[in-house]
Structure formats: C-alpha cells, structure tokens
Amino acid sequence: RIYLFDSSSRELFYHRGDEGLSYVDTGEELEDFLDEFPEKLLQRKSAYHKALESNPRLSPKEFYESIELMVLIIDDTDELAERCSGTQKAMAGCLALAAETGCGIIATVQSMKSKGYDEVTKFFKTTTEGILLGNPGSSSVFPAVSARNLPVMGEGLLYHGGEFERVLLPGFEMTQEEG
C-alpha cells in the first residue's frame, strides 16, 4: 500500500486513483489518514510481536519484509508540515511509528524552504538513515558532507548511523576515472 502526499505543484496528481495508492490531498483525506494509518501500523507491530512468540530470533527487518509493503511518499515535507499545522504531533507520531514498523518513507525537501522547527520537520532532521540525492550542501536534513564524499553524477549519498557512503544509483554505470 502506498500513501502519497503531493506538493502544491501537483506533479504526482496523475497517480490519484492508481490501484494500491491512497492520494492524500484534502483536509478530510488527511484527517482520515491520521485516523486510520496509525491503526494499520499498530496491527503490523502486533503481528510482529505475535510472530516473535513462535520465532524468538525473528528480526523486525525480516518480518516486515515478509508482509505487505507499505510506503509513504511525501513530496515536500514543508508543505506537509503546513497542512498538518493543527495535527503536527499526530503526524510526527505516524512517521515515527511507520519507520519503526518497516514502512518505507520517501520524502523530498526543498532546501531553501526547510527552516521549520515543527514536529514533522524535527522527525526528518533527526533521522539516522536515508539517501541524499542532489546537492549535499543545500540539504538541511543531513549534516554537512566532507569533500571526499561528494557524489558525482549517477551517485547518491547513503546516510547510515551518522556516516555517509557514496552509492551508485540504479541505471548508471561508473566510468574508470570516477571509480
């Protein structure tokens, strides 16, 4: 299941109505999401704890990879934060529970805009894992990148546990001089 929060540019609007996708746009849709989504996440968490009873060595990663894929796609975290102005804590709680229960979170940040100190922005700024695509100097989510880790065309920066690692993006091949 995919939950899509489009930006005001509506560049992803053509996905509205796609099978397996919930396009969250209006205030009513956001309210429904905040009512229903946490329950789905709690069901996932409960299912994991139940599976642990029969297999105490089952890792969360293994379990969540074996059940239905759930992904949140957020085009512009600042716009989402603005739309959630009265429900910041609920949305930040959803994001945290989503991450905890193996739900993928894909989000874009407009580097010139992300200045907020709201709950949603704080969630993203305190993340310990992610991949950075684009100019690392303009990201307000991840810490500064050392010169030796600056990516070249076709690469991204994987951020894990406070460290960056250059990674090749699918569809690109490294040349001899880049490698």
Language-model-detected regions and their locations in the chain:
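P-loop NTPase catalytic phosphate-binding loop
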Residues: 1-54, 64-136, 149, 175-178
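Conserved P-loop NTPase
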Residues: 136-179
